[in-house]
Each structure stands twice: as structure tokens, then as C-alpha cells.
Amino acid sequence: MSDSREIKKPWWFKKAKEWADEFYTRDQKLEDSDRRDLSKKYATISKASVVGAATGLSAGLGGPYAYRYYTTGALKGVKLPRTILLGVVSMVIMRNVAAKIAWDKELKKLDPSGELKQNYKSAHKTVDDVSLSDNSTSVQKKYGMMKFLKYRTAPRWAMYFEGTYQHPDRKFPNPDQMVQDLKGSRRAFPPFFSKADKFWHQIDRKDNDHT
């Protein structure tokens, strides 16, 4: 029977912690040369997303006017609010499409034969297992990291990997240590953080019960 005092950590906390743990593990295995290469790859993806966003915005804003002029010979009658909305939607869609295409191309450069991609789809052995092992190659580690991070926040990762290449001391910290630091500093919070303090207290008690 479980302890009635036990509290479940919020789903968002668990998800964030799981993501942080995996990223930290992958990040620690990267060499300086890996970081530089990943920075360049994500910079390329970032540039592609900017071009895609600009193309989508231009098409969304200019499309209705071009269609109106083609069908009526005049530009009057185009509803501006609808056109702006179409432009924004087109910008977001094309940004993601362009980033995805660039991301696929960069993965292909790492895996021209398709071997890593095939392993990644395997039900028994994934590229994640290989890229996280102590014997993983530079290509496997970079491929695994890019598969993990995806492409939607390319500018952030381009800056992160370049920054940690230049300054290794700025690497992502150990998530377990971050949690311990938060626990240690919780009593410095103002009174309106009392619920957060209660949450950390219950986590402390749960951890102590298992020791």
C-alpha cells in the first residue's frame, strides 16, 4: 500500500525533468567539434526558416491582391484584416515547412547511406541507444541530438552550441543539481509562493521516505 502522504509531482514537472535529463546526457557526450558542427547545422536550419517565413508572409499578403487584380483588373475589395491573418498563418506554416526540409537535409548529410535512419525505426535497436552509448561516434551523437531536438527552435540551438563551443562552462547544468538548488532556495520565496513551498516540502518528504 502506498503512503497516504505521498504526492504525485505535476505532469509538467515530470515531462520537463525527463527532457532535461535526456538533453543533459546527450549534451555531456558531445565534443567541441560536435558542438561547432551542430551550431552550423542549426544556423543553416534557422536561415531556411527565416526565408520560409518571409516567403509565406509575402504570399499571404500579396496573394489576395494578385488574385483580385487578375480577376477584376483592380485592387479594391480586398479585406485587409483577412489578408493580414492569411499572411501570418502562411508565415508560420512556411517557416516550419522550410525548417523541416533543411533539418532533413542536414540529417541526410550525417547519414547519406540511411543506416542510422533505418536503425532509428527499428523496434529492437534505435539510434538513441547507439548515440547514448560510450562507444558512439561523433556522427551518431550528432544525429541522435538532432533527432531529439527537432527543428522548431533552430535559432536557440544554433546559439547554444556555438556558445558552449566558445565557453564550455556554460553547458546545460545537471538537472538533479538544479532541483536540489530549487529545494534549498524555496524558503526565500515571498508568502504568495506558499503552495510551491508546500510542493517542495512534500517532495522532500517523499525522497526521505525512500532513503
Swiss-Prot record:
Pfam families: DUF1689. Induction: Expression is inducible by fluconazole. Expression is positively regulated by the master transcriptional regulator PDR1 which probably binds the PDRE motifs TCCACGGA (positions -770 to -763) and TCCGTGGA (positions -740 to -733) of its promoter. It is a multi-pass membrane protein. The keyword DNA-binding does not apply. It is found in: Mitochondrion membrane. It comes from the Eukaryota. GO terms for cellular component: mitochondrial membrane; mitochondrion. The chain crosses the membrane at residues 45-67, 82-99. Its main location: mitochondrion. Keywords: Membrane, Mitochondrion, Transmembrane, Transmembrane helix, Virulence. Disruption phenotype: Leads to an increase in phagocytosis but does not influence binding to host macrophages in infected mice, when the pleiotropic ABC efflux transporter of multiple drugs CDR1 is also deleted. Belongs to the PUP1 family. Mitochondrial protein that contributes to the enhanced virulence of C.glabrata strains that acquired azole resistance. This is PDR1 up-regulated protein 1.
